[in-house]
Protein backbone atom coordinates (compact mmCIF):
# COMPACT_ATOMS: atom_id res chain seq x y z
CA UNK A 1 0.00 0.00 0.00
CA UNK A 2 1.38 3.35 -1.06
CA UNK A 3 0.27 6.89 -0.35
CA UNK A 4 1.23 10.11 -2.07
CA UNK A 5 1.06 13.14 0.18
CA UNK A 6 -1.20 15.89 -1.09
CA UNK A 7 -0.16 19.54 -1.26
CA UNK A 8 -0.78 21.29 2.03
CA UNK A 9 -3.59 23.88 2.10
CA UNK A 10 -2.83 27.47 3.16
CA UNK A 11 -2.02 27.70 6.85
CA UNK A 12 -0.94 24.07 7.21
CA UNK A 13 2.64 22.84 7.36
CA UNK A 14 3.67 21.07 4.19
CA UNK A 15 3.93 17.28 4.45
CA UNK A 16 7.43 16.03 5.27
CA UNK A 17 7.00 12.92 3.11
CA UNK A 18 5.88 12.93 -0.51
CA UNK A 19 5.09 9.19 -0.46
CA UNK A 20 5.43 6.11 1.73
CA UNK A 21 4.68 2.41 1.30
CA UNK A 22 5.06 -0.90 3.10
CA UNK A 23 6.48 -3.77 1.08
CA UNK A 24 4.44 -6.85 0.19
CA UNK A 25 4.97 -8.79 3.44
CA UNK A 26 5.13 -5.72 5.71
CA UNK A 27 8.77 -6.24 6.68
CA UNK A 28 10.03 -2.99 5.17
CA UNK A 29 8.94 0.64 4.83
CA UNK A 30 9.91 2.92 1.93
CA UNK A 31 9.56 6.70 2.00
CA UNK A 32 10.05 9.38 -0.64
CA UNK A 33 10.96 13.02 -0.04
CA UNK A 34 12.04 16.04 -2.05
CA UNK A 35 15.63 14.96 -1.44
CA UNK A 36 15.33 11.28 -2.46
CA UNK A 37 14.13 8.07 -0.81
CA UNK A 38 14.88 5.77 2.13
CA UNK A 39 14.21 2.12 2.98
CA UNK A 40 13.74 0.88 6.54
CA UNK A 41 13.64 -2.58 8.10
CA UNK A 42 10.70 -3.34 10.40
CA UNK A 43 12.26 -6.16 12.41
CA UNK A 44 12.37 -4.33 15.75
CA UNK A 45 10.04 -2.16 17.79
CA UNK A 46 12.68 -0.21 19.68
CA UNK A 47 15.04 0.52 16.81
CA UNK A 48 14.28 1.59 13.25
CA UNK A 49 17.13 0.52 10.98
CA UNK A 50 17.69 2.34 7.71
CA UNK A 51 18.55 -0.25 5.06
CA UNK A 52 19.29 2.19 2.26
CA UNK A 53 19.06 5.85 1.37
CA UNK A 54 19.59 7.70 -1.90
CA UNK A 55 19.68 11.37 -2.85
CA UNK A 56 20.45 10.74 -6.51
CA UNK A 57 16.80 11.07 -7.56
CA UNK A 58 15.05 14.15 -6.15
CA UNK A 59 11.36 14.75 -5.60
CA UNK A 60 10.36 11.07 -5.40
CA UNK A 61 6.61 10.41 -5.36
CA UNK A 62 6.55 6.62 -5.88
CA UNK A 63 8.94 4.14 -4.28
CA UNK A 64 8.23 0.40 -4.06
CA UNK A 65 10.50 -2.37 -2.80
CA UNK A 66 10.07 -5.99 -3.86
CA UNK A 67 9.75 -7.96 -0.61
CA UNK A 68 13.20 -7.89 1.08
CA UNK A 69 15.18 -8.06 -2.16
CA UNK A 70 17.47 -5.37 -3.54
CA UNK A 71 14.99 -4.39 -6.23
CA UNK A 72 13.41 -0.97 -5.80
CA UNK A 73 11.20 0.94 -8.25
CA UNK A 74 11.26 4.74 -8.17
CA UNK A 75 9.34 7.52 -9.95
CA UNK A 76 10.20 11.21 -9.59
CA UNK A 77 8.20 14.38 -10.17
CA UNK A 78 11.09 15.55 -12.35
CA UNK A 79 10.24 12.74 -14.81
CA UNK A 80 6.72 11.58 -13.89
CA UNK A 81 6.36 9.43 -17.01
CA UNK A 82 9.52 7.42 -16.36
CA UNK A 83 9.86 4.34 -14.15
CA UNK A 84 13.35 3.52 -12.85
CA UNK A 85 14.27 0.07 -11.53
CA UNK A 86 17.37 -0.20 -9.33
CA UNK A 87 19.50 -2.82 -7.60
CA UNK A 88 20.18 -0.65 -4.57
CA UNK A 89 22.72 -3.00 -2.99
CA UNK A 90 24.96 -2.68 -6.04
CA UNK A 91 24.04 0.93 -6.68
CA UNK A 92 23.12 0.20 -10.30
CA UNK A 93 20.13 0.98 -12.48
CA UNK A 94 18.57 -2.14 -13.99
CA UNK A 95 16.31 -0.42 -16.48
CA UNK A 96 13.96 2.47 -17.07
CA UNK A 97 10.76 2.75 -19.07
CA UNK A 98 8.85 5.80 -20.28
CA UNK A 99 5.08 5.88 -20.77
CA UNK A 100 2.57 8.04 -22.60
CA UNK A 101 1.31 9.85 -19.49
CA UNK A 102 2.15 10.31 -15.82
CA UNK A 103 2.65 7.18 -13.73
CA UNK A 104 0.11 7.10 -10.90
CA UNK A 105 0.98 3.87 -9.09
CA UNK A 106 3.15 0.76 -9.33
CA UNK A 107 2.47 -2.71 -7.94
CA UNK A 108 4.75 -5.74 -8.01
CA UNK A 109 5.10 -9.34 -6.90
CA UNK A 110 7.57 -12.08 -7.79
CA UNK A 111 6.08 -12.56 -11.26
CA UNK A 112 4.55 -9.28 -12.38
CA UNK A 113 5.19 -5.54 -12.28
CA UNK A 114 2.20 -3.27 -12.98
CA UNK A 115 2.38 0.35 -14.06
CA UNK A 116 -0.93 2.18 -13.69
CA UNK A 117 -1.69 5.30 -15.73
CA UNK A 118 -4.98 7.18 -15.66
CA UNK A 119 -6.57 5.21 -18.51
CA UNK A 120 -4.34 2.15 -18.95
CA UNK A 121 -2.38 -0.49 -17.04
CA UNK A 122 0.91 -2.00 -18.27
CA UNK A 123 1.73 -5.55 -17.17
CA UNK A 124 5.43 -6.52 -17.23
CA UNK A 125 7.13 -9.85 -16.59
CA UNK A 126 9.39 -8.99 -13.68
CA UNK A 127 12.02 -11.57 -14.68
CA UNK A 128 13.04 -9.71 -17.84
CA UNK A 129 10.78 -6.61 -17.76
CA UNK A 130 9.17 -7.67 -21.03
CA UNK A 131 5.81 -5.99 -21.59
CA UNK A 132 3.19 -8.73 -21.63
CA UNK A 133 -0.04 -6.79 -21.92
CA UNK A 134 -1.52 -3.31 -21.96
CA UNK A 135 -5.00 -3.04 -20.53
CA UNK A 136 -6.47 -0.09 -22.41
CA UNK A 137 -9.67 1.95 -22.22
CA UNK A 138 -10.19 1.48 -18.51
CA UNK A 139 -12.48 4.07 -16.87
CA UNK A 140 -10.65 7.22 -15.86
CA UNK A 141 -8.65 6.36 -12.74
CA UNK A 142 -7.03 9.65 -11.63
CA UNK A 143 -5.68 8.24 -8.36
CA UNK A 144 -4.14 5.13 -9.94
CA UNK A 145 -6.21 2.87 -7.70
CA UNK A 146 -5.35 -0.79 -8.27
CA UNK A 147 -4.27 -3.87 -6.33
CA UNK A 148 -2.06 -6.86 -7.15
CA UNK A 149 -2.08 -10.15 -5.28
CA UNK A 150 1.35 -10.85 -3.79
CA UNK A 151 0.74 -14.56 -4.45
CA UNK A 152 2.65 -15.05 -7.71
CA UNK A 153 0.81 -18.31 -8.46
CA UNK A 154 -2.29 -16.30 -9.40
CA UNK A 155 -1.15 -12.64 -9.69
CA UNK A 156 -4.70 -11.33 -9.61
CA UNK A 157 -5.13 -7.67 -10.49
CA UNK A 158 -8.08 -5.53 -9.38
CA UNK A 159 -8.99 -2.07 -10.65
CA UNK A 160 -12.10 0.15 -10.86
CA UNK A 161 -14.56 -0.77 -13.58
CA UNK A 162 -16.59 2.43 -13.42
CA UNK A 163 -16.18 6.13 -12.70
CA UNK A 164 -19.57 6.44 -11.02
CA UNK A 165 -20.11 3.15 -9.18
CA UNK A 166 -18.02 0.79 -7.06
CA UNK A 167 -17.54 -1.87 -9.71
CA UNK A 168 -14.30 -3.87 -9.51
CA UNK A 169 -12.68 -5.64 -12.46
CA UNK A 170 -10.82 -8.81 -11.43
CA UNK A 171 -8.04 -9.69 -13.89
CA UNK A 172 -5.67 -12.69 -13.97
CA UNK A 173 -2.15 -11.35 -14.38
CA UNK A 174 -0.76 -14.76 -15.32
CA UNK A 175 -3.26 -15.83 -18.00
CA UNK A 176 -3.79 -12.16 -18.97
CA UNK A 177 -7.57 -12.51 -19.03
CA UNK A 178 -10.47 -10.85 -17.23
CA UNK A 179 -11.90 -13.13 -14.55
CA UNK A 180 -15.08 -11.30 -13.48
CA UNK A 181 -16.54 -7.99 -12.39
CA UNK A 182 -17.80 -7.38 -8.86
CA UNK A 183 -20.53 -4.88 -7.96
CA UNK A 184 -18.90 -3.98 -4.67
CA UNK A 185 -20.42 -0.59 -3.77
CA UNK A 186 -22.93 1.95 -4.99
CA UNK A 187 -20.41 4.78 -4.77
CA UNK A 188 -16.99 5.23 -6.38
CA UNK A 189 -14.16 3.06 -5.06
CA UNK A 190 -11.59 4.52 -2.67
CA UNK A 191 -9.55 1.44 -1.68
CA UNK A 192 -9.05 -2.18 -2.76
CA UNK A 193 -6.65 -4.83 -1.50
CA UNK A 194 -5.99 -8.60 -1.69
CA UNK A 195 -5.05 -10.88 1.16
CA UNK A 196 -1.68 -12.64 1.00
CA UNK A 197 -2.97 -15.78 -0.75
CA UNK A 198 -5.07 -13.87 -3.28
CA UNK A 199 -8.24 -15.66 -2.13
CA UNK A 200 -9.98 -12.57 -0.70
CA UNK A 201 -10.49 -9.02 -1.94
CA UNK A 202 -11.52 -6.12 0.32
CA UNK A 203 -12.93 -2.80 -0.85
CA UNK A 204 -14.24 0.53 0.40
CA UNK A 205 -16.09 3.31 -1.38
CA UNK A 206 -15.53 7.06 -1.20
CA UNK A 207 -18.10 7.28 1.61
CA UNK A 208 -15.81 5.13 3.74
CA UNK A 209 -18.57 3.81 5.99
CA UNK A 210 -18.82 0.19 4.78
CA UNK A 211 -15.99 -2.22 3.96
CA UNK A 212 -16.76 -5.44 2.10
CA UNK A 213 -14.73 -8.61 1.56
CA UNK A 214 -15.26 -10.87 -1.46
CA UNK A 215 -14.05 -14.34 -2.41
CA UNK A 216 -11.58 -14.63 -5.28
CA UNK A 217 -12.05 -15.60 -8.06
CA UNK A 218 -15.80 -16.15 -7.48
CA UNK A 219 -16.57 -12.58 -6.41
CA UNK A 220 -19.05 -13.64 -3.69
CA UNK A 221 -19.49 -11.36 -0.67
CA UNK A 222 -18.05 -12.96 2.46
CA UNK A 223 -18.00 -10.17 5.06
CA UNK A 224 -19.40 -6.70 5.54
CA UNK A 225 -17.99 -4.33 8.13
CA UNK A 226 -19.21 -0.91 9.21
CA UNK A 227 -16.46 1.59 9.94
CA UNK A 228 -18.86 4.25 11.17
CA UNK A 229 -22.29 5.83 10.75
CA UNK A 230 -22.00 9.51 11.67
CA UNK A 231 -19.82 10.86 8.89
CA UNK A 232 -18.25 10.05 5.56
CA UNK A 233 -14.47 9.69 5.56
CA UNK A 234 -11.68 9.18 3.04
CA UNK A 235 -10.14 5.71 3.39
CA UNK A 236 -6.41 6.10 2.80
CA UNK A 237 -5.31 2.49 3.26
CA UNK A 238 -6.83 -0.96 3.52
CA UNK A 239 -4.75 -4.05 4.28
CA UNK A 240 -5.10 -7.65 5.48
CA UNK A 241 -2.81 -9.19 8.06
CA UNK A 242 -0.51 -11.82 6.55
CA UNK A 243 -2.58 -14.63 8.09
CA UNK A 244 -5.81 -13.05 6.73
CA UNK A 245 -7.31 -13.04 10.22
CA UNK A 246 -7.61 -9.25 10.41
CA UNK A 247 -8.38 -6.35 8.08
CA UNK A 248 -7.12 -2.87 8.90
CA UNK A 249 -8.39 0.49 7.57
CA UNK A 250 -7.04 3.99 8.11
CA UNK A 251 -8.56 7.26 6.96
CA UNK A 252 -8.38 11.03 7.34
CA UNK A 253 -9.79 10.70 10.87
CA UNK A 254 -7.94 10.05 14.13
CA UNK A 255 -9.06 6.39 14.34
CA UNK A 256 -7.66 3.27 12.69
CA UNK A 257 -10.16 0.38 12.57
CA UNK A 258 -9.24 -3.31 12.72
CA UNK A 259 -11.84 -5.92 11.78
CA UNK A 260 -11.64 -9.63 12.54
CA UNK A 261 -12.38 -12.31 9.96
CA UNK A 262 -14.50 -14.70 11.97
CA UNK A 263 -14.68 -18.27 10.71
CA UNK A 264 -17.51 -18.62 8.20
CA UNK A 265 -20.04 -21.39 8.75
CA UNK A 266 -22.67 -22.70 6.37
CA UNK A 267 -25.49 -22.32 8.89
CA UNK A 268 -26.06 -20.37 12.07
CA UNK A 269 -25.86 -22.59 15.21
CA UNK A 270 -29.00 -23.07 17.27
CA UNK A 271 -29.52 -20.44 19.94
CA UNK A 272 -29.53 -21.74 23.53
CA UNK A 273 -32.97 -22.34 25.08
CA UNK A 274 -32.81 -19.24 27.28
CA UNK A 275 -34.73 -15.99 27.31
CA UNK A 276 -31.78 -14.06 25.82
CA UNK A 277 -31.30 -16.74 23.19
CA UNK A 278 -34.98 -16.58 22.27
CA UNK A 279 -34.88 -12.79 21.98
CA UNK A 280 -31.77 -12.97 19.82
CA UNK A 281 -33.49 -15.38 17.49
CA UNK A 282 -36.56 -13.14 17.26
CA UNK A 283 -34.33 -10.12 16.60
CA UNK A 284 -32.60 -11.84 13.67
CA UNK A 285 -35.95 -12.94 12.26
CA UNK A 286 -37.28 -9.38 12.49
CA UNK A 287 -34.49 -8.08 10.27
CA UNK A 288 -36.10 -9.93 7.36
CA UNK A 289 -39.04 -7.50 7.53
CA UNK A 290 -36.99 -4.31 7.73
CA UNK A 291 -36.04 -2.18 4.70
CA UNK A 292 -32.98 -3.59 2.94
CA UNK A 293 -30.65 -0.77 3.99
CA UNK A 294 -31.65 -1.06 7.66
CA UNK A 295 -31.42 -4.86 7.59
CA UNK A 296 -27.93 -4.71 6.08
CA UNK A 297 -26.84 -2.26 8.78
CA UNK A 298 -28.08 -4.57 11.54
CA UNK A 299 -26.03 -7.44 10.13
CA UNK A 300 -22.77 -5.52 9.66
CA UNK A 301 -19.90 -6.29 12.02
CA UNK A 302 -18.15 -3.54 13.97
CA UNK A 303 -14.46 -2.99 14.53
CA UNK A 304 -12.71 -5.62 16.65
CA UNK A 305 -9.97 -3.19 17.65
CA UNK A 306 -9.01 0.45 17.12
CA UNK A 307 -5.89 2.56 17.15
CA UNK A 308 -6.06 6.22 18.20
CA UNK A 309 -3.87 8.70 16.34
CA UNK A 310 -2.81 12.04 17.80
CA UNK A 311 -3.71 13.77 14.54
CA UNK A 312 -6.39 13.84 11.86
CA UNK A 313 -6.48 15.06 8.29
CA UNK A 314 -2.94 13.91 7.47
CA UNK A 315 -2.23 11.34 4.79
CA UNK A 316 -1.35 8.00 6.37
CA UNK A 317 -1.11 4.29 5.69
CA UNK A 318 -1.45 1.35 8.06
CA UNK A 319 -0.46 -2.29 8.16
CA UNK A 320 -0.57 -5.28 10.50
CA UNK A 321 2.66 -7.12 11.10
CA UNK A 322 4.28 -9.55 13.52
CA UNK A 323 7.37 -7.95 15.05
CA UNK A 324 9.40 -9.80 17.66
CA UNK A 325 6.72 -12.52 17.73
CA UNK A 326 3.85 -10.20 18.66
CA UNK A 327 1.10 -8.69 16.47
CA UNK A 328 1.51 -4.96 15.88
CA UNK A 329 -0.38 -2.16 14.20
CA UNK A 330 1.90 0.17 12.24
CA UNK A 331 0.87 3.60 10.95
CA UNK A 332 3.11 5.80 8.80
CA UNK A 333 2.05 9.42 8.31
CA UNK A 334 2.99 12.24 5.98
CA UNK A 335 4.41 14.24 8.90
CA UNK A 336 7.38 11.86 8.83
CA UNK A 337 6.61 9.49 11.70
CA UNK A 338 5.99 5.78 12.18
CA UNK A 339 3.67 4.80 15.03
CA UNK A 340 3.77 1.26 16.46
CA UNK A 341 0.90 -0.16 18.54
CA UNK A 342 0.34 -3.43 20.35
CA UNK A 343 -2.68 -5.42 19.14
CA UNK A 344 -4.50 -7.88 21.39
CA UNK A 345 -5.51 -10.69 18.97
CA UNK A 346 -7.85 -12.30 21.50
CA UNK A 347 -9.85 -9.46 23.04
CA UNK A 348 -9.22 -6.56 20.66
CA UNK A 349 -10.16 -3.18 22.11
CA UNK A 350 -8.01 -0.09 21.87
CA UNK A 351 -4.45 -0.70 20.67
CA UNK A 352 -1.70 0.71 22.88
CA UNK A 353 0.86 3.05 21.32
CA UNK A 354 4.28 1.79 22.35
CA UNK A 355 6.72 3.57 20.05
CA UNK A 356 7.03 6.58 17.76
CA UNK A 357 9.89 6.75 15.27
CA UNK A 358 11.03 9.70 13.20
CA UNK A 359 11.49 8.70 9.56
CA UNK A 360 13.65 11.72 8.78
CA UNK A 361 16.35 11.30 11.41
CA UNK A 362 18.38 8.51 9.78
CA UNK A 363 16.91 5.67 11.79
CA UNK A 364 17.18 7.13 15.31
CA UNK A 365 14.04 7.25 17.43
CA UNK A 366 12.42 10.24 19.08
CA UNK A 367 11.68 8.58 22.39
CA UNK A 368 14.98 6.82 23.00
CA UNK A 369 17.76 9.08 21.82
CA UNK A 370 19.95 7.47 24.46
CA UNK A 371 20.05 4.57 22.02
CA UNK A 372 22.85 6.54 20.36
CA UNK A 373 25.09 5.03 23.05
CA UNK A 374 24.70 1.63 21.42
CA UNK A 375 27.56 0.26 19.29
CA UNK A 376 27.75 2.11 16.00
CA UNK A 377 25.97 0.59 13.03
CA UNK A 378 27.78 -0.66 9.93
CA UNK A 379 28.47 1.89 7.16
CA UNK A 380 25.50 3.01 5.11
CA UNK A 381 24.47 1.11 2.02
CA UNK A 382 25.61 4.04 -0.09
CA UNK A 383 29.12 3.42 1.23
CA UNK A 384 28.77 -0.34 1.03
CA UNK A 385 27.73 -0.50 -2.61
CA UNK A 386 30.63 1.78 -3.56
CA UNK A 387 33.09 -0.93 -2.54
CA UNK A 388 34.17 -3.59 -5.03
CA UNK A 389 31.73 -6.45 -4.64
CA UNK A 390 32.11 -10.16 -5.22
CA UNK A 391 29.27 -12.18 -6.67
CA UNK A 392 27.71 -14.44 -4.06
CA UNK A 393 26.54 -17.80 -5.31
CA UNK A 394 22.88 -18.58 -4.79
CA UNK A 395 21.39 -21.67 -3.23
CA UNK A 396 19.44 -22.24 -6.44
CA UNK A 397 21.56 -23.87 -9.18
CA UNK A 398 22.27 -21.54 -12.07
CA UNK A 399 21.62 -18.29 -10.18
CA UNK A 400 24.09 -15.67 -9.08
CA UNK A 401 23.33 -12.39 -7.35
CA UNK A 402 22.51 -11.00 -10.79
CA UNK A 403 20.02 -13.80 -11.32
CA UNK A 404 22.42 -15.68 -13.60
CA UNK A 405 22.00 -13.32 -16.53
CA UNK A 406 24.83 -11.60 -18.34
CA UNK A 407 24.46 -8.04 -19.54
CA UNK A 408 21.83 -7.90 -22.25
CA UNK A 409 20.76 -11.52 -21.78
CA UNK A 410 17.77 -13.21 -20.19
CA UNK A 411 17.72 -16.49 -18.28
CA UNK A 412 16.32 -19.28 -20.51
CA UNK A 413 12.80 -20.28 -19.51
CA UNK A 414 13.80 -23.86 -18.67
CA UNK A 415 15.95 -22.58 -15.81
CA UNK A 416 12.77 -21.52 -14.03
CA UNK A 417 11.33 -25.03 -14.20
CA UNK A 418 12.10 -25.76 -10.55
CA UNK A 419 10.13 -22.75 -9.38
CA UNK A 420 10.34 -18.97 -9.11
CA UNK A 421 13.37 -17.14 -7.80
CA UNK A 422 13.40 -16.58 -4.04
CA UNK A 423 13.40 -12.81 -4.25
CA UNK A 424 13.13 -12.39 -0.50
CA UNK A 425 16.74 -13.58 -0.35
CA UNK A 426 18.92 -10.50 -0.80
CA UNK A 427 21.60 -12.65 -2.48
CA UNK A 428 19.21 -13.28 -5.34
CA UNK A 429 17.72 -10.90 -7.81
CA UNK A 430 15.26 -11.24 -10.69
CA UNK A 431 17.08 -11.90 -13.98
CA UNK A 432 16.23 -8.55 -15.55
CA UNK A 433 17.82 -7.43 -18.78
CA UNK A 434 19.67 -4.12 -18.56
CA UNK A 435 17.52 -1.98 -20.81
CA UNK A 436 16.07 1.34 -21.75
CA UNK A 437 12.45 1.24 -22.83
CA UNK A 438 9.61 3.36 -24.06
CA UNK A 439 5.99 2.24 -23.94
CA UNK A 440 4.11 4.51 -26.31
CA UNK A 441 2.17 2.23 -28.58
CA UNK A 442 4.26 -0.82 -29.45
CA UNK A 443 2.31 -2.99 -27.09
CA UNK A 444 0.05 -5.98 -26.95
CA UNK A 445 -3.34 -4.48 -26.25
CA UNK A 446 -6.64 -5.59 -24.84
Swiss-Prot record:
It is a peripheral membrane protein. Residues 386-406 are annotated as: Disordered. Keywords: Autophagy, Cytoplasm, Cytoplasmic vesicle, Cytoskeleton, Endosome, Golgi apparatus, Lipid-binding, Membrane, Repeat, WD repeat. It is found in: Golgi apparatus, trans-Golgi network; Endosome; Cytoplasmic vesicle, Clathrin-coated vesicle; Preautophagosomal structure membrane. InterPro entries: PROPPIN, WD40/YVTN_repeat-like_dom_sf, WD40_repeat_dom_sf, WD40_rpt. One of its GO terms (molecular function) is phosphatidylinositol-3,5-bisphosphate binding. Its main location: Golgi. One of its GO terms (cellular component) is phagophore assembly site membrane. It comes from the Eukaryota. The keyword Repeat applies. WD repeats lie at residues 184-224, 230-269, 312-351. A motif (L/FRRG motif) lies at residues 225-228. The keyword Membrane applies. One of its GO terms (biological process) is positive regulation of autophagosome assembly. It holds the Pfam family PROPPIN. A motif (Nuclear receptor interaction) lies at residues 131-136. Interacts with androgen receptor (AR) and the estrogen receptors ESR1 and ESR2. Interacts with WIPI2. Interacts with WDR45. Interacts with ATG16L1. May interact with NUDC. Component of the autophagy machinery that controls the major intracellular degradation process by which cytoplasmic materials are packaged into autophagosomes and delivered to lysosomes for degradation. Plays an important role in starvation- and calcium-mediated autophagy, as well as in mitophagy. Functions downstream of the ULK1 and PI3-kinases that produce phosphatidylinositol 3-phosphate (PtdIns3P) on membranes of the endoplasmic reticulum once activated. The N-terminus might form a beta-propeller domain involved in specific binding to phosphatidylinositol 3,5-bisphosphate (PIP2), leading to the association of the protein to the membrane. Association to the membrane can also occur through binding to phosphatidylinositol 3-monophosphate (PI3P). Belongs to the WD repeat PROPPIN family. This is WD repeat domain phosphoinositide-interacting protein 1.
Amino acid sequence: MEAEAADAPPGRVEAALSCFSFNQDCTSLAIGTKAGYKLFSLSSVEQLDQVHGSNEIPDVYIVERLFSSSLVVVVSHTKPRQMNVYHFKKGTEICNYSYSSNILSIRLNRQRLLVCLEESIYIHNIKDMKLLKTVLDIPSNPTGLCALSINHSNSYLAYPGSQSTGEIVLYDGNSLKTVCTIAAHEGTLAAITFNSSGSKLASASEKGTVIRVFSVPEGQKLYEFRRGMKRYVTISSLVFSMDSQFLCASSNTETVHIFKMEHLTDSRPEEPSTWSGYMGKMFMAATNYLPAQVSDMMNQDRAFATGRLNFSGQKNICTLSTIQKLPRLLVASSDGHLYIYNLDPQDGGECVLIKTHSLLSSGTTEENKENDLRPSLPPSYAATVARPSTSAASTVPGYSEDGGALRGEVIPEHEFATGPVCLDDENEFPPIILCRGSQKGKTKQS
